[in-house]
Regions:
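Hydrophobic aliphatic residue packing
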Residues: 1-2, 30, 99, 124
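Structured catalytic cores of enzymes that bind and process phosphorylated ligands/cofactors
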Residues: 9-15, 26, 89-96, 129-144
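Conserved residues at the C-terminal ends of beta-strands
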Residues: 14, 68, 124
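Canonical P-loop GTPase G-domain recognition
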Residues: 102-146
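Switch II of P-loop NTPase G domains
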Residues: 5-10, 14-27, 33-62, 72-84
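Conserved nucleotide-binding/hydrolysis micro-motifs of P-loop NTPases
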Residues: 2-4, 34-36, 72-75, 102-106, ...
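Conserved C-terminal guanine-recognition region of P-loop GTPase G domains, centered on the G4
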Residues: 50-120
Length: 146
């Protein structure tokens, strides 16, 4: 639910490799607060914004920003602001992946329009397990070059 995450949550993921000496590599996924959606005081949002900016700018190991966008509402101001913000602070070695969620809720013409409007996007449905492998591949390709 948008706005429910109010803390930074970390998830360490183990990836299996073909290297006998190093059979696993690890990546940490970080779930950041969706501060644009949260129903909290403006002063708290301002504090989150400062802390988030500092966090993102001071982490040289951050490689990928995955921006989850509700495919039913792809042009929300908050999503445009997030995209602009991340593009402003990201380094040349970092990428942004726009992952459009809940694509199962769109009819075929709506989905086709979304794909035309956002050709670099990845279109996913957790419910129908659509696009999940493509998203995983995009992430692992950037992280590990495979």
């Amino acid at each position: 639910t948008p706005g429910k995450t109010q803390l930074i949550n970390y998830f360490e993921i183990k990836f299996k490799t073909n290297d006998v000496e190093n059979p696993y590599v690890y990546a940490r996924f970080v779930d950041l607060p969706g501060f644009g959606y949260a129903k909290v005081a403006k002063s708290l949002k301002a504090s989150w914004n400062r802390n988030l900016t500092s966090y993102l700018e001071q982490r040289p190991n951050l490689q990928i920003f995955v921006h989850l966008i509700d495919s039913r509402h792809p042009n929300l101001e908050i999503d445009k602001n997030v995209d602009e913000f991340v593009n402003h602070i990201k380094r040349g070695d970092q990428i942004i992946i726009n992952a459009f969620t809940k694509t199962d809720k769109l009819n075929s013409s709506e989905l086709n329009k979304l794909k035309r409007d956002y050709p670099a996007g990845i279109f996913v449905s957790n419910l129908k397990k659509i696009g999940i492998i493509e998203l995983q591949n995009k992430i692992t390709e950037h992280l590990f070059g495979n």
